Amino acid sequence: MFYNREVKPLSDTWGVSGKITVNAILNSLDDVAMQHAELTGDDVLERSKNAVNWVMTGWDIRILNLPKNNEEYKIKTWVNSNIGALSSTREFLLMDTAGNPCVKAQAYISILDLVRNRPVRFSDTDLARYQPEPDTVIEAPVKKIAAPKEFIAEKTLVVRRSDIDFNEHVHNTTYLTLAMEVLPEELYKEQNFQAIRINFKKALVLDDVATIKLAQTEQGYVVAIYKE
């Protein structure tokens, strides 16, 4: 099942470059995924009360052209039918109003036992309700990124209440916001990103002290977030 949604940018989604920020794009993708879940009757809040819920274990994002502040766009999403025992991918295609691709993304999804902090196997209905499709937006996914041994900058922040979601963890899109804190100023302002790969290992929670470290490699910048 493909789910489509039109999005009208709000003023808090614009960056100083006049483009929609990648943080806002990621939030839009996440919002549309939640709307798709509601359409299928998959109540994530009820799942959270039962201490077993969907989590995203990573993002692979390819940026072709960020929409400008006055440009509406549409998002198409679906669950991929290439399903493992413990994980699958949710596909996203962000397009301008003419249907031209602007952003392609994959979210790696699993179901987590929130008490034991361990993934659990999908049930017969977990993914079937989404009527998975074989289409994929990224033919050559980026492998997980190893943390560098040497860093060129770092910043320490404390996790706030506003960073926490209904699972009582830092929300998955907020980690990109944290990573932006150590990027070079010009890159942050201009938003000249071509690809972003996010790996999640362990969730941050309220009042955690997070050290955000920046490294530069031949492929680009790498940000690692450590819990003190």
Can you say where each PLM-predicted feature lies in the sequence?
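Hot-dog-fold acyl-thioester-processing enzymes
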Residues: 1-56, 100-106, 113-194
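HotDog/MaoC-like acyl-thioester-processing domains
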Residues: 3-4, 60-144, 200-206, 215-228
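Structured core of small recognition/catalytic domains
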Residues: 166-228
